[in-house]
């Protein structure tokens, strides 16, 4: 278990590998493309029509680009996004990503009790050594804003249902968009229980 924890932490500490080194998006061009996105994600990019839809506003540009590229190629399958990116060039995806990255993020609030929030904070900041779960702060920062240069996403303020869904998909290896990072998210999530995922998602919602 100790070796597994150290291996996971080492992977988390490695520099991110990205298909594109520097962000190249133009927010002004992305704004026009985002009009259709507003139907599901809201005009502000943070008012999804369903509780399991992510906030896009303020999300890190490189992360957004990489996810959109995987969705467009079919590497990441999202039924809700079917057909939405047909005909988009890589530049279009960069522009769209830049537009949302430049929108103000939306703060959320945690709903858990003190005991739940304390436990969640302990996991987020320090991991769970006995289960080989690395601290979330290693990649996503104490504030939950992620690492824009590395392409690690901002988690702060994301809807609870969305975060629960993504951690569960990683745990069950349904989502595999962490291949370029050595499968780190699947390694982190694979031993988390439903209750641990739930309190983490609530805690993350309140980060800012």
Predicted regions and their residues:
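Sequence context surrounding c-type heme c attachment/ligation sites in exported
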Residues: 28-35, 61, 125-137, 156-165
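Axial heme c-ligation environment in periplasmic c-type cytochrome domains
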Residues: 48-55, 70-112, 148-154, 173-198, ...
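The canonical Cys-X-X-Cys-His
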Residues: 35-43, 96, 133-142, 200
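Bacterial N-terminal signal peptides
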Residues: 6-16
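Electrostatic cytochrome c docking/interface patches
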Residues: 17-34, 44-52, 102-130
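Positively charged n-region of N-terminal signal peptides that target proteins for export
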Residues: 1-5
